Amino acid sequence: MLSNDILRSVRYILKANNNDLVRILALGNVEATAEQIAVWLRKEDEEGFQRCPDIVLSSFLNGLIYEKRGKDESAPALEPERRINNNIVLKKLRIAFSLKTDDILAILTEQQFRVSMPEITAMMRAPDHKNFRECGDQFLRYFLRGLAARQHVKKG
């Protein structure tokens, strides 16, 4: 999935505005303006579309973890990944929203997306593990949609 799509989805999940995203990015040690965020939130076919760099998305997700769970001063700071993939996004969202594997399974089941518990745990493994499984775009899309539905009902 494009970093822009993920950023747009997470913004919707949080019901946040561009200034909120600037604040979360600052927690991840990235300086950005509301205007820059607006460019990244455009769809691919819109004029002025600019791809959101992976390192910015990674820093945003790190900032989201700090926003949701607080910053642990005793732990080392989260380092942003230069190349981000769906597995990393899934792991960071899982941490930020304090989700367990059961929660992820429930979210996907609510979206009528069939997946088993071992498949989910395989996506959480290290890439060099023999049972590692790559997180596909469709899986992440359904997860983001389900997480949005769950968060909006909670706040509702």
From Swiss-Prot:
It comes from the Bacteria. Pfam families: DUF1456. InterPro entries: YehS-like. This is Uncharacterized protein YehS.
